[in-house]
């Protein structure tokens, strides 16, 4: 069994405080998986431009620790006995189409104060400056909306407080605190930019930049699963690797790195998103078959064994394969079948025969079953930079040969 790494603000493996309540359940679920369960695992496919509300499997949120959950900069929450449906009375500014949207109205309800973050006052959203547009993704506990804040396009994530379950509400509050604390302290060109957050009695709200290009998975789907041009694929892979090198350098783990959570900016650069709250559904509802995350998940996470930052490296290997091939990983399997094949038969995606050797080497090292064999992201960045140089050099040589083959002309 692997020993979880010791991080300043992160507990890993089976030591998550939030894992204890459902550990037995997940073990039973894995037992069924190990017996060859053929449950449907189709993803919700709710990729978005500011995060994701798709569900995943082993997802105590990024940076989970008592120190982070109990951060002194986070206000205690007052509890109200109202539901979202009961709260809507005097809305703030929403589009006409959202008049019947209870979550949006609950956020804008002026009868209740906006609760922000002490010591993080600059991150507390001023709802007077927030204009909400249509929802573009949703899950069991919330929705994602496009909107504007101070005139800037933003993605607005709203999570609903469970009405009749204090335990679920407490857990979701912890997840909200963790994601806000993470995003407020992560500043990198390849990390989705955090704009602010707030609470209302019935909802939590997180606002991030809006990535107009959608997710990498949506991009590949629009291309009808055709491979991304190699130069662009390597550039985007480098964006992800650099962002993750930064995240790991801050002693955090993402835990749900996949193409759904990689957002494309207007300049085609990649932004890593989804650092916590979007993955609350599994722990609040128990292990669920409605997830596609198994396709990217490291075997030690699938088996609920102790893990460390190398789970993100494994997932990156799968993402790199996606960019190179344009295909959905294990597309001929359900996600549960893929998980079974990965863990019990060592199956991995097939590397194309014409794949650049350096890229093939990166993929296979990243998704090695042994986490100790997987490179760190700092090394991955160096390897991809070498691949990028090789691709550019080859292209220049090809252009030079083309020029030599053309007859000389005199003007």
Curated annotation (Swiss-Prot):
* SMART domains found in the cross-reference section: S_TKc (SM00220)
Which InterPro entries does the record match to this protein? Kinase-like_dom_sf, Prot_kinase_dom, Ser-Thr/Tyr_kinase_cat_dom, Ser/Thr_kinase_AS, Ser_Thr_protein_kinase
Alphabetical list of Pfam families matching this protein: PK_Tyr_Ser-Thr (PF07714)
Phenotypic consequence of residue 181 to A:
No effect on kinase activity
Outcome recorded upon mutating residue 215 to A? Loss of kinase activity
Question: Which residue ranges run through the membrane?
Answer: none
Q: Name a biological process GO annotation.
A: protein phosphorylation
**Which residues does ATP bind?**
136-144, 157
CDD domains under this entry? STKc_MAP3K-like
This enzyme's EC code(s): 2.7.11.1
Domain Protein kinase, by residue range, is 130-392
Reaction(s) catalysed by this chain, per the record, are: L-seryl-[protein] + ATP = O-phospho-L-seryl-[protein] + ADP + H(+); L-threonyl-[protein] + ATP = O-phospho-L-threonyl-[protein] + ADP + H(+)
Query: Where does the record place the catalytic residues?
Result: 256 (proton acceptor)
Residues with Phosphothreonine modification? 288
Entry function: Serine/threonine protein kinase that phosphorylates proteins on serine, threonine and tyrosine residues.
Q: What is this protein called?
A: Serine/threonine-protein kinase STY13
